[in-house]
UniProtKB/Swiss-Prot annotation:
Protein name per the record: Zinc finger protein SNAI2
Subcellular location: Nucleus; Cytoplasm
Entry GO CC: chromatin; cytoplasm; cytosol; nucleoplasm; nucleus
Organism per entry: Mus musculus (Mouse)
Entry comment, domain topic: Repression activity depends on the C-terminal DNA-binding zinc fingers and on the N-terminal repression domain.
Amino acid sequence: MPRSFLVKKHFNASKKPNYSELDTHTVIISPYLYESYPIPVIPKPEILTSGAYSPITVWTSSAAPLHSPLPSGLSPLTGYSSSLGRVSPPPSSDTSSKDHSGSESPISDEEERLQPKLSDPHAIEAEKFQCNLCNKTYSTFSGLAKHKQLHCDAQSRKSFSCKYCDKEYVSLGALKMHIRTHTLPCVCKICGKAFSRPWLLQGHIRTHTGEKPFSCPHCNRAFADRSNLRAHLQTHSDVKKYQCKNCSKTFSRMSLLHKHEESGCCVAH
């Protein structure tokens, strides 16, 4: 019976065939496994002669055609290869000649904008911060601001004038503190006396209430103001702050020194 008329058996893909039960060890797996079609048998490769094989051809650049035919409706794509993916085209002869001649390659507008202009000294000088009063230049804005605040002679001559008197001040804060001596915004509610500072008003109110929170640690005296206590502590110290030039006596207060000088200082002979 010919092999082409063999009866097809149900094939199980998960089960390995038993080659000992077959007439030939060649197993044919075809995508069309139907009972109505016979399965052809391919002969063994040993029966093929050496002349059936084509000789091995070596691919060289000389053997490649200059222009391969393309189907109609398709245009050739430059810079691409069918097997190796994208291949960058070789540089043209004009570009290579310019590079070897020493001329610069073209630069895009974005690269030219981002490239630092180090060759232009005027551009570097323009980036410095210059004082408009004394023409001094600084590399940072903070250095220029510090110069204007402290070291610039022209800036130090700028002053703020008081509208109530002829006094002038360098800073605006000092002028505002001086204006309080004219306006006297702190007013006593008991007697109507006005003061320029709130702590001066607080010390004045203690004269009405009789409160003396600052007491001397050496004696029983107490004071309403801290400055009066500091002046009193000079009486207990061995070295007084104010000294007479004639008799070298020392006093705790300037007022006591003035009384001593007005009474007639006795010069020691």
